[in-house]
């Protein structure tokens, strides 16, 4: 009897023998805005990944982006951080930092976790009902933090240069702020644990192009204890920890696993596929973030297929341990989107055929 999507995901994560590679496709709002009907023509030919998609579902004249993701838009989140959109369909930047001056900390009010997520309101009763409905349908129960829940939130609040100085000088108020953010996030984590989730995601970008942003020593001092505090209750209940981070993080990957991460969503070519194999394969499940800097946006369809095949052959196994994620952003042309979707479909069951 074939596995359900939920069973296959969990077996893949646990490396106990799945039947296909779980694959996740994210089409950015910017790509929708750029390609429109040309994108529709691609997606309609991939019902395996987009089973409910039909031409004409989107009204492009009425398409509106959240101010956070709209060129010229301004948005103040529940922490008081001010966001400005730069490009339609891509999340903007924070350039208003409510704790830029530490003197503001005494009067600073955290969001209320009972009613407020960082980016908007929350109705926990409604979410509980949604989770119950998903459980009844046999679906994977997944949840997670907002992107940028701790390290990035710190520089949203303080400003990047200020945060780097805080870490380097051992500013005592920094630990106070970290504890405040962790306490706020713990409430959210516990709500989902009480709902019986299968996997919980912690997402933020810890890496730059060639190395992690703060390095192993500063990560161990400032961030790892907070990660452990948030992740260990999940692990104690048998919940998988999915950790997304863009950028190079191989210099802190051991610490991430020690904190509790069981599924590492990391970028492929920044680290090198062979390095990922040598450092991670068999230790943690790899949710491979497929290149969106060179081959997929700028390569040929043949180069794209060769990349996907090589990654599946190198990192995959009949035991599982490999998932794949592709985020599609400009300037990826329609033919390359088609190529990456075709290749992902072609090699999804490579290890079981």
Predicted regions and their residues:
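Segments that shape or occlude catalytic/ligand-binding pockets
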Residues: 32-68
């Amino acid at each position: 009897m074939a596995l359900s999507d939920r069973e296959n995901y969990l077996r893949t994560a646990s490396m106990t023998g799945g039947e296909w590679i779980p694959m996740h496709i994210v089409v950015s709002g910017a790509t929708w805005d750029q390609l429109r009907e040309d994108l529709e023509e691609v997606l309609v030919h991939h019902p395996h990944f987009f089973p409910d998609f039909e031409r004409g579902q989107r009204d492009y004249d009425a398409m509106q982006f959240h101010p956070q993701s709209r060129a010229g838009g301004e948005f103040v989140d529940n922490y008081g951080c001010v966001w400005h959109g730069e490009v339609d369909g891509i999340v903007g930047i924070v350039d208003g930092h409510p704790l830029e001056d530490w003197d503001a900390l005494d009067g600073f009010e955290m969001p209320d976790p009972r009613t407020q997520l960082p980016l908007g309101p929350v109705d926990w009763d409604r979410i509980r009902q949604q989770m119950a409905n998903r459980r009844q349908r046999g679906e994977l129960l997944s949840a997670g933090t907002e992107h940028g829940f701790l390290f990035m939130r710190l520089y949203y609040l303080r400003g990047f240069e200020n945060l780097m100085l805080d870490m380097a000088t051992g500013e005592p108020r920094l630990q106070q702020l970290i504890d405040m953010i962790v306490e706020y996030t713990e409430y959210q984590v516990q709500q989902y644990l009480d709902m019986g989730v299968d996997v919980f995601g912690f997402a933020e970008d810890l890496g730059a192009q060639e190395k992690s942003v703060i390095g192993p020593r500063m990560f161990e001092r400032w961030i790892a204890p907070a990660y452990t505090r948030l992740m260990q209750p999940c692990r104690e209940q048998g919940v998988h920890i999915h950790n997304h981070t863009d950028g190079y993080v191989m210099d802190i990957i051991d610490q991430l696993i020690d904190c509790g991460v069981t599924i590492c969503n990391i970028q492929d070519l920044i680290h090198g596929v062979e390095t990922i194999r040598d450092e991670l394969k068999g230790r943690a499940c790899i949710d491979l973030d497929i290149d969106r800097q060179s081959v997929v946006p700028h390569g040929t369809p043949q180069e794209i297929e060769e990349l996907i095949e090589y990654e599946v052959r190198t990192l995959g196994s009949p035991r599982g341990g490999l998932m794949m994620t592709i985020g599609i952003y400009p300037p990826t042309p329609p033919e390359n989107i088609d190529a990456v979707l075709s290749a992902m479909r072609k090699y999804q069951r490579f290890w079981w055929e």
